[in-house]
Amino acid sequence: ADRGQTLKAFQEAEAYNGPSIIFAYAPCIAHGIDMSKTQTEQKRAVEAGYFPLYRYNPANEQPFTWDAKEPKESYQDFIKSEGRYKSLMKTNPSEAEALYEKAEKDAATRMSVFKAVGELLK
């Protein structure tokens, strides 16, 4: 979604003297998108708050770095555009809507927790 953030994450992981892990959003065929558009889908995931960008490096003076901006795309519009979520809507629309609402609330809570942790680690 952000090449600069990705490069920083890899550089920090490589330079850290210890185990490192990088979490990445990687669209697949089950998402129902044109696989030549994965970078666009990654950007949409970030812009909807589905996959916030952050880094944690215990070697840094400020270990937690929040790289995400406030979501500017609708979370539900994003998930409803992916095949794996569309299939749920086809099989059980009322349950799907309830789960979409819950997923959106969970994502907002997760974003708040990440921000709070980031503030604590400054």
Locations of the language-model features?
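Acidic carboxylate-rich catalytic motifs and surrounding loops in phosphoryl-/glycosyl-chemistry enzymes
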Residues: 1-3
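Glycine/aspartate-rich loop-and-adjacent alpha/beta segment that forms the canonical ThDP
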Residues: 6-95, 102, 112-116
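Hydrophobic, well-ordered beta-alpha structural blocks that scaffold small-molecule cofactor pockets
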Residues: 107-110
